[in-house]
């Protein structure tokens, strides 16, 4: 059994390369595969391995006061969905390139828990009677596998395209409560913060993203699966993978 995890945390990282090297060595020693992204603004992790190794890795990470509150979303598969371990230092743990969307520079945008979103979707409005618009901040490749029913889907192929793609819809959204969402929370956190700082005061972020919603309340109101960036391809509302097969053996070198 393989534990598959997605986790991110915004925190000041003074020496990103040193931390990246440290986490890579720790993950390798634990037999983990996946991706470690480190930036001056924090960590973004997609790691998979034996459940005990995963637990140990995150326990040690949370022992660092900067990451004590890191939330980890976990699902399980029979097979390892990553071919190898990659560790990189980036300018941002998710590229947005908007100064007014940087979580270390502003208070976190208000978040809404999955149970409340589920209730609002059932009743067709928020607690003040305003229409609720679910705003998908992911790219079209991901959305093909599924999204919330009647979500506002933008024609974007990368996250940095979102502000321009959202512009034609802003007037129509002004009398609604907008709930931004994404896979695990990181993009909708940056998007919601940028929208608030750019004059949209009716924006919330779905706490934990789609995976958090699946984990806490299931798939009510969501149509299809949630795309993930590994060999599982997508997860259903029970966090079961669309594909769960052994990875192909590496081809022998011709040299």
Where are these regions (language model features)?
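A short acidic-Thr-Gly-centered motif at the start of a beta-strand
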Residues: 119-129
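Rhodanese-like catalytic fold shared by cysteine-dependent sulfurtransferases
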Residues: 1-110, 129-132, 138-178, 186-255
């Amino acid at each position: 059994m393989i534990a598959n995890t997605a986790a991110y945390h915004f925190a000041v990282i003074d020496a990103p390369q040193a931390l990246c090297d440290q986490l890579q060595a720790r993950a390798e020693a634990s037999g983990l595969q996946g991706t470690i992204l480190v930036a001056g603004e924090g960590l973004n992790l997609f790691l998979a391995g034996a459940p005990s190794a995963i637990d140990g890795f995150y326990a040690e990470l949370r022992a660092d006061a900067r990451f004590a509150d890191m939330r980890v979303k976990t699902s399980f598969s029979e097979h390892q969905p990553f071919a190898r371990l990659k560790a990189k230092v980036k300018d941002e743990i998710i590229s947005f390139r908007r100064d007014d969307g940087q979580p270390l520079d502003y208070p976190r945008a208000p978040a809404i828990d999955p149970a409340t979103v589920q209730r609002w979707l059932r009743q067709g409005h928020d607690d003040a009677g305003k229409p609720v618009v679910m705003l998908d901040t992911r790219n079209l490749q991901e959305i093909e596998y599924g999204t919330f029913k009647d979500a506002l889907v933008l024609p974007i192929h990368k996250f940095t395209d979102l502000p321009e793609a959202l512009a034609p819809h802003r007037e129509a959204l002004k009398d609604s409560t907008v709930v931004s969402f994404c896979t695990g929370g990181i993009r909708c956190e940056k998007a919601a913060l940028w929208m608030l700082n750019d004059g949209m005061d009716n924006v919330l972020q779905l706490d934990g993203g789609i995976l958090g919603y699946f984990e806490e309340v299931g798939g009510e109101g969501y149509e299809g699966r949630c795309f993930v960036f590994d060999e599982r391809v997508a997860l259903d509302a029970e966090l079961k993978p669309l594909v769960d097969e052994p990875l192909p053996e590496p081809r022998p070198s011709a040299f």
